[in-house]
């Protein structure tokens, strides 16, 4: 492994530090664990960088390493075991489109949106984070999570619906 | 209520439509308040989620730790790279020194044996050998109890150009060994036998001092043949000695 190889990795990977840490915090719900996850991700990625094929999506590759590292951690295993809920068989075609609540959405403060995201089950949460925070294309999300694009679309629709319902519900109760 | 374009609103908001579809939906949005409202709400939600979700940024100590880890690997890679190169150089140098010193030692041994051979030639026959006999069955047993090893002598037939004259104990590096004297057409040949390393080594010719010296290792013994006879004759005697000691 030469110096140029390390420099190349550093240039590609360091700009992803904040997004990876943010994703790790959401996944684990614990800053200390997120720190460890990110460090482990960088070490693993550098080790495996030789096998990374130029031209493929580096960002998706890094997020995939982080997510896989999380899934094999104790917290990851616990979350995986408790989150296999009513996801299978979901089809975007049957999503019911409620009346838009633009005014309510505008009232939602950051804290409420954060609480809504936090309530999502991991499979919906990670799709929403990658698509709306990291602004990944569906294809990139599919690569990161190793799932079909159709599943990305249906999970994303469902995640947004749940966030919206929670916000509407919370603000409705308040008023 | 459920406009046929509603399903495309999310794809439109996420920039997942191709240019023709994008334009088509844009045109539709201009005429459909329901879809426009849905799009606005979705964009609003995307913005809210982006702002609320970008909640954590890496603390400075994490950035330092990651950079440190990358640097450590880099430094260790550089260390190993240069360390390996340095170790290779050192190994080559050590091997060179070993080969050189071994060669020096070998040169010194040969020089001292040539000296002994020349000294012997200058002596009276009485002093050249301590056991004077052409019979190998007399010469070999004479060394019993005088040397910490044993060896075989080749049979010299009546028609052989070689003649065994006798032998005596010689020393080299404070180690006792056998010095045997042969003759071929008035040329005397000294054969020195000392203890050596196990294994065998090939015959080496050395004509550095105008004498022909051949040496080899066989069965844990070092053999040196020193003479001013020609090298073909030395080869012949060396071959007989090798066969006798296999």
Where do the PLM segments sit?
Chain A
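A short, charge-rich alpha-helical start-of-domain segment used by transcription regulators
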Residues: 1-22, 32-35, 46
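Sigma70-family region 2
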Residues: 2, 40-57, 76-78
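C-terminal edge and immediately downstream basic/flexible tail or linker adjoining helix-turn-helix-like DNA-binding
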Residues: 2-9, 82, 106, 139, ...
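Short, aromatic/basic-enriched loop-to-helix "N-cap" motif that marks the start
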Residues: 18, 50-64, 149
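Structural recognition of an alpha-helix C-terminal capping motif at a helix-to-coil junction
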Residues: 36-43, 56-68
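Arg/Lys-rich amphipathic alpha helix in sigma70-family domain 2
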Residues: 53, 64-85, 106
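Internal acidic/polar
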Residues: 80-106, 137
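Helix-turn-helix DNA-binding module
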Residues: 118, 122-126, 131-151, 165
